[in-house]
Amino acid sequence: MKRDFNEFKEFIKGKNVAVVGIGVSNIPLIKFLVKLGAKVTAFDMKSAEELGEISKEFEILGVNLELGKGYLDRLTGFEVVFKTPSMRIDSEALLRCKKQGAYITSEMEEFVRYCKGRVYGVTGSDGKTTTTTIVSKLLSQEGYKTWTGGNIGTPLFSNIEEIKEEDKVVLELSSFQLMTMDVEIDVAIVTNITPNHLDMHKDMQEYIDAKKNVFKYQRENDLLVINDENEITKNLDKEAKGKVVRFSSKKTEGEDAYYKDGKLYVHGKEVCKKDNIIIKGMHNVENYLAAFLAVYDEVSIESMKKVAETFGGVHHRCEFIREVDGVKYYNDSIASTPTRTLAGLKAFEKPVILLAGGYDKHVPFEPLAYEGYEKIKAIVLFGVTKEKIKAAFKRLEEEKGIHVPVYSGESLEEVVNIAKSIAESGDIITLSPACASFDMFKNFEVRGDKFKEIVNNI
């Protein structure tokens, strides 16, 4: 049951509120809380100089700033605490606040709690952003006023009073955002669950439990969309409270959406041909099947077909950059897990020269080697994980006698040059790192943009 936002306005007015993290989603949140009459203190590990103009703007607005080294030590004595998504609820600072009686929440939790529109929550280890974007495109194509947020789009909480009951709201939700969420999501989509973010979660079970929160608080009229090909997601129906629908790219019996003989079907109706979908790869077929099920009651088959045949994809996802000397270069920087890289490799019709490596999320790389070798002509490694990935391919050779040429470099420029030197006309070079970017870059977008810059300067 959605609550009246006036309740929140009355609750927050005059309260001593802490906001941890002065990032993209929290900047508009802080301004909004000030507008609602809260006494706001913003916390961040950066200094005022590093934050730049926004720190001056906040001071003018009357926001107290607690910045720099030891900033969380000063997180005490607040009535309400808005945490940043990556901050664990069992951190020392938040446990202290909880003991003091603080209400601990996040921008996304409060948004979903009070949002009047129909909320579609998309989560999963891979395919979240593309599926979120497809769902949003489908609803917009049908003529609905559609808002897109969460991990993508713009922070929505400060716009909550503009969102009407007939509007549609599509959210990409990470495991970090979901860990503490206890709110009802009308339509939940779980694309898949594979090992990911094990540097942040205690173990795989905690990661799975976080993902389950996307449907845990649903009621009987709500909808859960699950992947019937994934070992974990196919069993989620046992815990669902609402209606459950399934999709599969490999089988048809018992499936609500499926792929058969080159065509995509939803509830027995043909939507489109796989070859006519602009974004290639079987993983994108699965993304479309999930999206079709999520919006089936609101969107016509005609609109589904039109989006599938016109939507060109999201940046940094198997994105073609250019062809040089007969060699095609692709940017798949979004691929921050081995399973996402494997999905990207399957989109190509021939083995590729793969550029991989980066920040260590403590996930195994054996699947990349053992399941991906047929799609890899050579692999060029960089980043913190290069030795771990190299070891996985060495194990493949020792156990199966399968040799994949492995090269390595220190920088992205160096690995591009190595790949260029071993490539022949007709080859494909793709950046699909199977790792996060944080060892060398701010995020996967910056990594992808740098790769595009290097390739465009060849």
Swiss-Prot record:
Its main location: cytoplasm. One of its GO terms (biological process) is regulation of cell shape. Belongs to the MurCDEF family. It is found in: Cytoplasm. Cell wall formation. Catalyzes the addition of glutamate to the nucleotide precursor UDP-N-acetylmuramoyl-L-alanine (UMA). It catalyses: UDP-N-acetyl-alpha-D-muramoyl-L-alanine + D-glutamate + ATP = UDP-N-acetyl-alpha-D-muramoyl-L-alanyl-D-glutamate + ADP + phosphate + H(+). InterPro entries: Mur-like_cat_sf, Mur_ligase_C, Mur_ligase_C_dom_sf, Mur_ligase_cen, MurD. One of its GO terms (cellular component) is cytoplasm. ATP binds at residues 124-130. It comes from the Bacteria. Keywords: ATP-binding, Cell cycle, Cell division, Cell shape, Cell wall biogenesis/degradation, Cytoplasm, Ligase, Nucleotide-binding, Peptidoglycan synthesis. Its EC number is 6.3.2.9. It comes from Clostridium perfringens (strain 13 / Type A). This is UDP-N-acetylmuramoylalanine--D-glutamate ligase. Pfam families: Mur_ligase_C (PF02875), Mur_ligase_M (PF08245). Pathway: Cell wall biogenesis; peptidoglycan biosynthesis. GO terms for molecular function: ATP binding; UDP-N-acetylmuramoylalanine-D-glutamate ligase activity.
